């Protein structure tokens, strides 16, 4: 077999040199970027612009179960109607005047779709699961059975669907949680 021609050897050698040079340049640039970014911010970068907004939005998303004690809190519901707040109103634990007052507050801001009326506790917890909000705020003492037992009202699996369940009967805690 005859030896390869000199021009073919030169083309192969040139192609190999150019490929190696490109690989070295790309690797050098990558290392340079890693080193300079590590010096500037020590590797801790803030999230990109849109994800910051999403985190703030997720932190404020609340599901409020409107029991009698929460309905009695001195809160201006009009201020929270535009936020990421959904009110779950168990019809058996709510009086008509409060339903009307809350409904009017949300209607003024055209957010009446954020009020969900639930006929049963199973339906209420199903809504909590499907909404998947960041916080669920309630006073479970308002939902104890008529026999007076302190059986837990919050289902065990609810932590898979809601990040934080705030269950308190202290008025200041409820107001602070609702308003922040």
Swiss-Prot record:
One of its GO terms (biological process) is positive regulation of protein autoubiquitination. It is found in: Peroxisome membrane. One of its GO terms (molecular function) is ubiquitin-protein transferase activator activity. Belongs to the peroxin-22 family. Keywords: Membrane, Peroxisome, Peroxisome biogenesis, Transmembrane, Transmembrane helix. One of its GO terms (cellular component) is cytoplasm. It comes from Saccharomyces cerevisiae (strain ATCC 204508 / S288c). Its main location: membrane. Involved in peroxisome biogenesis. It is a single-pass membrane protein. The chain crosses the membrane at residues 15-32. This is Peroxisome assembly protein 22. InterPro entries: Peroxin-22, Peroxin-22_C_sf. It comes from the Eukaryota. Pfam families: Peroxin-22.
């Amino acid at each position: 077999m005859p030896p390869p021609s000199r021009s073919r050897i030169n083309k192969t050698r040139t192609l190999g040199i150019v490929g190696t040079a490109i690989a070295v340049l790309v690797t050098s640039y990558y290392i340079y970027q890693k080193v300079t970014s590590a010096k500037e911010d020590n590797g801790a970068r803030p999230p990109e612009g849109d994800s910051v907004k999403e985190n703030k939005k997720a932190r404020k998303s609340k599901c409020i179960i409107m029991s009698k004690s929460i309905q009695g809190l001195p809160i201006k519901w009009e201020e929270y109607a535009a936020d990421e707040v959904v009110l779950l109103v168990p019809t058996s634990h709510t009086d008509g005047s409060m339903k009307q007052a809350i409904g009017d507050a949300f209607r003024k801001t055209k957010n009446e779709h954020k009020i969900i009326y639930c006929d049963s506790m199973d339906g209420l917890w199903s809504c909590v699961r499907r909404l998947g909000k960041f916080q669920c705020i309630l006073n479970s003492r308002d939902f104890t059975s008529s026999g007076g037992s302190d059986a837990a009202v919050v289902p065990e699996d609810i932590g898979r669907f809601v990040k934080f369940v705030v269950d308190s009967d202290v008025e200041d805690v409820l107001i602070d949680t609702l308003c922040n």
